[in-house]
């Protein structure tokens, strides 16, 4: 499947690792999660090696919509029901902090980051939206 990212971005290539390597931390996977781990480790001066079996950002990251959100469908009602208020609050807070971190990172690079509103709707089950709002109000 073609991706907008592979059509519009020239990704760097790196030589294959040769011989034995010693590192404090090994990051397996060069998608967004792996690259972000490497970024934060580098900022802390921690020795790491990132390995990717194919091309950087060629897996899930390549096919992402690049939408960064804390709204992942109608999940908060389910989280409150199954995990409780405290853990649901921790999940929401972690997602909100991630959004803020992405925004701060994107101010340092040219990537056309924009904050936009998001919406959830239901044509058939409006009560699900009401449950979600109730969970978020808690």
Feature map (PLM): residue ranges:
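Short, hinge-like loop/turn segments at secondary-structure boundaries
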Residues: 66-70
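Dinucleotide-binding Rossmann-like beta1-alpha1 core, especially the glycine-rich loop
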Residues: 71-138
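Extreme N-terminal leader/targeting segments of oxidoreductases
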Residues: 1-25, 43
């Amino acid at each position: 499947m073609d991706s907008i990212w592979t059509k519009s971005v020239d990704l760097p290539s790196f030589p294959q690792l040769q011989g034995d390597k010693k590192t404090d931390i090994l990051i397996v996977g060069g998608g967004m999660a792996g690259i972000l781990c490497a970024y934060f480790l580098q900022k802390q001066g921690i020795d790491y090696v990132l390995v990717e079996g194919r091309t950087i950002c060629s897996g899930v990251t390549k096919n992402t919509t690049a939408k960064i959100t804390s709204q992942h469908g109608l999940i908060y009602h389910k989280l409150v029901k199954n995990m409780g208020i405290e853990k649901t609050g921790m999940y929401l807070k972690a997602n909100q902090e991630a959004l803020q971190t992405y925004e701060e990172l994107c101010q340092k690079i040219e990537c056309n980051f924009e904050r936009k509103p998001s919406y959830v709707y239901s044509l058939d089950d409006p009560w699900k939206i009401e449950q979600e709002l109730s969970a978020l109000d808690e």
